[in-house]
Amino acid sequence: MICISGIPGTGKSTICNLLNDLGYTCVEGNALAVKYGCLSGDEVDVDCLSDRMRSDNFKGIVAAHYAHLLPCNIVIILEADESALRQRMMDRGYSPEKIDENLDAQRSDTIYAESLERLPANRIFRIRNADLNVALSDILRIIGGRNG
């Protein structure tokens, strides 16, 4: 399974939709959580989701801010410019505290560090999403025709 992760506003959903348009199977993590009954209120139970995906032998690409915590073969971390991220999160109604928390997560490499606990560095990729076409091209090069 290929996992696309990153803080909110980095382009995970947009990339996932573009991959689907190209014939890949990319699913939003929250949709899988609903399908597998792994929601606890508004929160995704990552352990439940991981277990259900393993038992279902899920093959595909998953996009979510927590995707790197799932049973991934490859993790792609999307990153973006802080000013663009701040504006996107403001547009989505995030509180100033939540925006700062998310930006701090990108600055401190939290997702990369958590990914390293699960995978070797040569299976973790960072993509700077400044230009959507370049980011998509980089991702296609990484996944090399694999669909999970």
Curated annotation (Swiss-Prot):
Query: What enzyme class is recorded for this protein?
Result: transferase
**Gene3D superfamilies found in the cross-reference section:** P-loop containing nucleotide triphosphate hydrolases
Region (LID) residue spans: 91-101
Q: Where does ATP bind?
A: G9, G11, K12, S13, T14, R92
Molecular function terms from GO: adenylate kinase activity; ATP binding; ATP hydrolysis activity
Biological process terms in GO annotation: ribosomal small subunit biogenesis; rRNA processing
Q: Which reaction does it catalyse?
A: AMP + ATP = 2 ADP; ATP + H2O = ADP + phosphate + H(+)
Annotated spans, NMP = 28-44
Origin, by domain of life?
Answer: Archaea
Q: Which UniProt keywords apply?
A: ATP-binding, Kinase, Nucleotide-binding, Ribosome biogenesis, rRNA processing, Transferase
Indicate yes or no for the key word Hydrolase.
no
Per the UniProt record, which EC number(s) apply here?
Answer: 2.7.4.3
Is Transferase among this UniProt entry's keywords? yes
Q: Which Pfam families match?
A: AAA_18 (PF13238)
Q: Which HAMAP family match?
A: Adenylate_kinase_AK6
- What role does it play? Broad-specificity nucleoside monophosphate (NMP) kinase that catalyzes the reversible transfer of the terminal phosphate group between nucleoside triphosphates and monophosphates. Also has ATPase activity. Involved in the late maturation steps of the 30S ribosomal particles, specifically 16S rRNA maturation. While NMP activity is not required for ribosome maturation, ATPase activity is. Associates transiently with small ribosomal subunit protein uS11. ATP hydrolysis breaks the interaction with uS11.
- Describe, as the record does, how this protein assembles with itself and its partners: Interacts with uS11. Not a structural component of 40S pre-ribosomes, but transiently interacts with them by binding to uS11.
Give the family this protein belongs to, as stated in its UniProt record.
Belongs to the adenylate kinase family. AK6 subfamily.
Q: Specify the protein name.
A: Putative adenylate kinase
- Please give the organism: Thermoplasma acidophilum (strain ATCC 25905 / DSM 1728 / JCM 9062 / NBRC 15155 / AMRC-C165)
